[in-house]
Structure formats: C-alpha cells, structure tokens
Amino acid sequence: MIAMRRDVHGILLLDKPLGVSSAGAVARVKYLYQARKAGHTGSLDPLASGALPVCLGEATKFGAHLLDADKTYRVTARLGERTASADLESPVIETQALPALSAAAIEAALAAFPREYAQVPPMHSALKQDGKPLYEYARAGITREREARLIRIHELRLLDWTAPDLHFDVRCSKGAHIRVLAEDLAARLGTIAHLTGLRRLGVAPFDAEPLWTLEALEALSAPALAAALLPVDAALRGWRRLDLPAGGVEAFRQGQTVATADDEPGTVRIYAEGLGFLGLGEIRPAGRLVPLRLISAVANRA
C-alpha cells in the first residue's frame, strides 16, 4: 500500500551524511515526514557532510532566501597534490614537493587573501550549461568555458597545519566553491592542493541551531518529528517585521495592495494577530504594502 502524503510545513536542519547526495537526503526526509513537497536550499556534494536546510510544504516558497545566505565550512586540504576534480572523487594527477611552510606563513596568507574576488566555477560542479550539469561534461572529458562569479570571503581561520594537511574554517557568500578556494589559496602558498574533507557547519541565519542526523530522525515519534521542524518564517529572520491591522488582512491575503502606516520602503515579513505569519510584502512609496509571497491558509493553521 502506498502511504498517503500530507501537508507538512517547516524547515528541518539536516546533518547530511557523507556518501549521500543532497537529493537523496531530501528524499529520505520527505519519506520520513510523508510530506507532499520538499526541497533543499543549496546542495552539498556526496563527499561533503553537514548543514542542509530542508524546506517542507509552504517553506519551499522561501528557500531562495537560504540559497542566497552566507555559509560556513570546515575544510581539510592536502597540499602538494592535485586531482582533476579538486577533491577525492578522482585520483591524484600531479604532485609537487612542498615549499617550507610555517603556520605563521599560512596565517599571513589567509589574512592577505582577497575578501572579494572573481572565482571560476570548477568543471566538477552542479552548475548547468545547455541543460546539463558541468560534472557530466567533466566525466566525459569535455571542458566548457565558465564565467567567473564574484564571491565574498568574510572570514578565514587556520585550525591546524600538519604537513601536508591544512585545516581551516571559512565563512563565505553564496556561490563560493570551496575546492576552488583551496586551490587558489594553495597557489598563493606556492603549491597545489585538493580537498580531502569538507563539512558545512552552518547556513545563515541558522549558524547556532543544532542539526538532525537521519538516524536521529528515524528514531523519533510523529510528534517529535513535528517538533524538530522550525517554523516557515525561520528563514526570514533577517527581514523587518510588520504586524498588519485586522482591517487589511483579508485584502492582503487575496493579493491586493493595502495601506500601511509604515512608510519605510523595503521588504518585510507580514504577520496578523491570530494568524501569525502571512508571507512577504514590499512597502512602496505613500505607505502602499504590496504582497510578494504569501503562504496558504492551511499553513497558517499548521
């Protein structure tokens, strides 16, 4: 008998295990919750582990805000060796004798590393060209031209240097490819490198939140599974809040522009007494509040 899917709304902070694709991990979460709709907010390679926010139900409407969020990673890179994929997916194709590197020299290189630079995405990535992910071209031995993308590095912190393995944490903007960062950093140190370990520690704004493993979720009762979910609006903590007066609620929920006493322009989270979170709106000149993204009445009651 096929289990009936149901409406489940919220965000699960999954600790994706090694060896499992992001899509595969989401499928397991979707099955555990018997959810009609689920999606992740920024894939992790099978050889990476860690924070993977999974949006269920109406939370999927706001997943793009997590795609745009800053992320923090714990990185292990092996210096003096290069692979075609820049990680452990492919064999070593080049080795170099390591230059004399001290922890102090590496600290200096981390401090001097550009905080904003144009990074060329790797061929071994999920970015698509002509409808196919780049890694499919790479596995067929085809190299495609890739446009450099501006990324931001907010923090680089050395954890340990025990040659040839370099351990560091990085907090960066969306779109940053850590395997390319490791290669670029190695080049500044006069050598080559590839990733041997990668763990995503957090995704803003959830950096301090605990993560759930699949094994822990599988052991939970139905009520405990529900309690593990963050509310739909958790992804929007950084947005300004606006409480809508009762007189404008129905029109707003029907997608109509309503008046507001708040005339500061910008995107806001909208709430109503007794209903909670309604969605996102934009305050425009003359105190006009325009609906941008609304959740269903069912999700309000969930």
Residue ranges of predicted features:
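Accessory RNA 3′-end/elbow-binding domains used by RNA modification enzymes
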Residues: M1-L44, A48, A104, R188-A302
